Amino acid sequence: MRHRKSGRQLNRNSSHRQAMFRNMASSLVRHEIIKTTLPKAKELRRVVEPLITMAKQDSVANRRLAFARTRDKEVVGKLFNELGPRYEERPGGYTRIMKCGFRTGDNAPMAYIELVGRPEVEEVEEVAEEAAE
């Protein structure tokens, strides 16, 4: 029986799953939107949301915990310098999962997972153009 077993196996052993979600969490924090399969996106939400909640309180201990979970100094810096202050007033629910059809080849359900309230691409391009002038 499968009572009280949380999380999906995703046809991987535990070390592979841990490494995969560490990489995916780093990519999501870095790019703020990634495309993946729907089950992976739903599991990734369980990894990323506690990291952002941790980033709301900037302390050495929290930075070390975040580094232990992501193994990427750049990502830890972005978490605590940008994302923590951005979501200071939001009590959870930092990610959004949007279904985007099925993958060609194996028909796997695909989804975008993004950080809520991320800056739009057009705004970033306009700011870059203004800075160039």
From Swiss-Prot:
GO terms for molecular function: structural constituent of ribosome. PANTHER family: LARGE RIBOSOMAL SUBUNIT PROTEIN BL17M (PTHR14413:SF16), RIBOSOMAL PROTEIN L17 (PTHR14413). Disulfide bonds: none annotated. This is Large ribosomal subunit protein bL17. Gene3D superfamilies: Ribosomal protein L17. PROSITE patterns: RIBOSOMAL_L17. Part of the 50S ribosomal subunit. Contacts protein L32. Keywords: Ribonucleoprotein, Ribosomal protein. GO terms for cellular component: cytosolic large ribosomal subunit. Belongs to the bacterial ribosomal protein bL17 family. The keyword Ribonucleoprotein applies. The keyword RNA-binding does not apply.
